Amino acid sequence: MVWLMEALKTKENETTKEKKLTTKVEKSEKKEENVREEEIVCPICGSKEVVKDYERAEIVCAKCGCVIKEKLFDIGPEWRAFDHEQKIKRCRVGAPMTYSVDYNEPIIIKENGEIKVVKIGELIDKIIENSENIRREGILEIAKCKGIEVIAFNSNYKFKFMPVSEVSRHPVSEMFEIVVEGNKKVRVTRSHSVFTIRDNEVVPIRVDELKVGDILVLAKELPNIEEDIEIDKKFSKILGYIIAEGYYDDKKIVLSYDYNEKEFINETIDYFKSLNSDITIYSKDLNIQIEVKNKKIINLLKKLRVKNKRIPSIIFKSPYEIKKSFIDGIFNGKDAKVFVSKELAEDVIFLLLQIKENATINKKSINDIEVYEVRRITNIYTNRKLEKLINSDFIFLKIKEINKVEPTSGYAYDLTVPNAENFVAGFGGFVLHNTIHDKGLSTVIDWRNKDSYGKDLSANKRAQLYRLRKWQRRIRVSDAAERNLAFALSELDRITSKLGLPRHVRENAAIIYRGAVEKGLIRGRSIEGVVAAAIYAACRRCRVPRTLDEIAEASRVDRKEIGRTYRFLARELNIKLTPTNPIDYVPRFASELGLPGEVESKAIQILQQAAEKGLTSGRGPTGVAAAAIYIASVLLGCRRTQREVAEVAGVTEVTIRNRYKELTEHLDIDVTL
């Protein structure tokens, strides 16, 4: 009887605990539901668009990136205690999103004391490729950056050089080109932010919220860093003219003038005579050509790297008078100058901004050659009603056009400027919003139950860490879609690694798969099948050919299922891909067969002739490519058997023989077997 009473008492205690737990869960769910239903407004920009950052249990503004302190998820006292150090970083800018700039956009940087203009894509590609520690966040590649500074404005609206802490890149399928007054332009993604004027304040605005006629903020003048250099005003002016209109080699410097430029001709002759140079003058029609021989000057030009038609770094660091003389030499007393080199035109624009001059840019075509006309403007327009901004380094220009364009390289590029959230880039000095925000340190709990000294933890500590790991897994992967992505992306990495696919193909496949998840196309289909189809589509989009059979073997998914899923994704996601070109397979097949470059070139030539006659239409690209390689190997004496070629190409010997007969007959190729 006693044991029965004890059992009933135990059962009653368990029921009470279960009711308390249920009540606690219901209260927690109700509290979270109230947070969801309550309208959340960003205290910084006033936006109502928010994003849940499950990595840190935060709600983040989708526009400006502010972490909203009052709206944190409540995920338990143990986690809050463990994550206490992160709380001091609340209300920092740290949106889990990315903005982006096109590869070709110019940006002025300071590196190792040198100031130069480079393409942002070229700069970031170099940093990432040389980095030993690349961090990945989804499709984003992020690398630390040291020793590079870019121009950004401070709280007083003055520009200065500031250090870059991180750079990144990610695949992109579209860009938007913004053109403002003076034909200044920049290419960015739709989610990128530029700066405009609202209530006499400079504020960021997304590109997809812009319209023609809106006012954008650009740089009116850039900071000067002056150093004592061994260049005088006369040489600076001649140097500008050499870069614009002259050239030199190991023996001589050649300068060309119009006949009516007598004042400048005499000035040039007098200058070089003062340096004991040998001068020869040639005259033809209305042109005057001056040939100068002076070994010391030629060596100085080589040292300054003048031959590449870019403004030397030393000019960007020169005093105002030297820069002014250099610009006078470039323009040769005229208000406008035509440049064939876009890079030189970009350099001139940035140098003009350093001497507080502005310019318009017009793209023209002369004899089917694209040129860039830069016209100097000394009187800069500013809006006098904006009294707080009159003394700033800004100029305010209206938008003329917003056009959707293709990206230059398939990638978009980002960088982080701490404590500034902006930088200057683009053809004309656009002020762009800081692209990657610093999200602070991530909390990662090690799987080992050891302390910092390597000693084993007590049973209580191990139990606490077990619960913390469980909470971390829950907040990192919080819903079915994220669990799906976590598994799918690991499967994607496995398959692409097995196929030896480059990184940009992996990232394109990830974009396609993520798009399928967001549109709800995964339901009713296997994750492995959709991943394999996304990889096949990415291979075709990036022109890195892989057959369905190869992907089926690597993914362990049936070939027909991959094909069906691929067609479904292409239709629903509007993926437009051209038929695979047999030529794309030639380099890989030739490499695996150990054939020289001559055979590869001959096979490509055969396929080009076949395409012109329509022999590749309706034929499997791998079979046609294999037959062309077989024919080329026989013709050039590097013969491979049909069986060897068939094994590499993944086709049958019968297919090769059939394609071989078609090609030799219709192209009149005489092959001696």
UniProtKB/Swiss-Prot annotation:
<dbReference type="InterPro" id="IPR023486">
    <property type="entry name" value="TFIIB_CS"/>
</dbReference>
<keyword id="KW-0862">Zinc</keyword>
<dbReference type="GO" id="GO:0006352">
    <property type="term" value="P:DNA-templated transcription initiation"/>
</dbReference>
<keyword id="KW-0479">Metal-binding</keyword>
<keyword id="KW-0540">Nuclease</keyword>
<feature type="repeat" description="1">
    <location>
        <begin position="490"/>
        <end position="573"/>
    </location>
</feature>
<dbReference type="InterPro" id="IPR013137">
    <property type="entry name" value="Znf_TFIIB"/>
</dbReference>
<dbReference type="InterPro" id="IPR036844">
    <property type="entry name" value="Hint_dom_sf"/>
</dbReference>
<dbReference type="InterPro" id="IPR030934">
    <property type="entry name" value="Intein_C"/>
</dbReference>
<feature type="domain" description="DOD-type homing endonuclease">
    <location>
        <begin position="238"/>
        <end position="357"/>
    </location>
</feature>
<dbReference type="InterPro" id="IPR003587">
    <property type="entry name" value="Hint_dom_N"/>
</dbReference>
<dbReference type="GO" id="GO:0016539">
    <property type="term" value="P:intein-mediated protein splicing"/>
</dbReference>
<keyword id="KW-0068">Autocatalytic cleavage</keyword>
<dbReference type="GO" id="GO:0003700">
    <property type="term" value="F:DNA-binding transcription factor activity"/>
</dbReference>
<feature type="binding site">
    <location>
        <position position="64"/>
    </location>
    <ligand>
        <name>Zn(2+)</name>
    </ligand>
</feature>
<dbReference type="InterPro" id="IPR013763">
    <property type="entry name" value="Cyclin-like_dom"/>
</dbReference>
<comment type="similarity">
    <text>Belongs to the TFIIB family.</text>
</comment>
<dbReference type="GO" id="GO:0097550">
    <property type="term" value="C:transcription preinitiation complex"/>
</dbReference>
<protein>
    <recommendedName>
        <fullName>Transcription initiation factor IIB</fullName>
        <ecNumber>3.1.-.-</ecNumber>
    </recommendedName>
</protein>
<dbReference type="InterPro" id="IPR004042">
    <property type="entry name" value="Intein_endonuc_central"/>
</dbReference>
<dbReference type="GO" id="GO:0070897">
    <property type="term" value="P:transcription preinitiation complex assembly"/>
</dbReference>
<keyword id="KW-0255">Endonuclease</keyword>
<dbReference type="GO" id="GO:0017025">
    <property type="term" value="F:TBP-class protein binding"/>
</dbReference>
<dbReference type="Pfam" id="PF14890">
    <property type="entry name" value="Intein_splicing"/>
</dbReference>
<dbReference type="GO" id="GO:0004519">
    <property type="term" value="F:endonuclease activity"/>
</dbReference>
<feature type="binding site">
    <location>
        <position position="42"/>
    </location>
    <ligand>
        <name>Zn(2+)</name>
    </ligand>
</feature>
<feature type="binding site">
    <location>
        <position position="45"/>
    </location>
    <ligand>
        <name>Zn(2+)</name>
    </ligand>
</feature>
<keyword id="KW-0677">Repeat</keyword>
<dbReference type="GO" id="GO:0008270">
    <property type="term" value="F:zinc ion binding"/>
</dbReference>
<keyword id="KW-0805">Transcription regulation</keyword>
<dbReference type="InterPro" id="IPR003586">
    <property type="entry name" value="Hint_dom_C"/>
</dbReference>
<dbReference type="InterPro" id="IPR027434">
    <property type="entry name" value="Homing_endonucl"/>
</dbReference>
<feature type="repeat" description="2">
    <location>
        <begin position="584"/>
        <end position="665"/>
    </location>
</feature>
<dbReference type="InterPro" id="IPR006142">
    <property type="entry name" value="INTEIN"/>
</dbReference>
<feature type="binding site">
    <location>
        <position position="61"/>
    </location>
    <ligand>
        <name>Zn(2+)</name>
    </ligand>
</feature>
<keyword id="KW-0651">Protein splicing</keyword>
<feature type="zinc finger region" description="TFIIB-type">
    <location>
        <begin position="38"/>
        <end position="69"/>
    </location>
</feature>
<keyword id="KW-0863">Zinc-finger</keyword>
<dbReference type="GO" id="GO:0006314">
    <property type="term" value="P:intron homing"/>
</dbReference>
<keyword id="KW-0804">Transcription</keyword>
<comment type="function">
    <text>Stabilizes TBP binding to an archaeal box-A promoter. Also responsible for recruiting RNA polymerase II to the pre-initiation complex (DNA-TBP-TFIIB).</text>
</comment>
<keyword id="KW-0404">Intron homing</keyword>
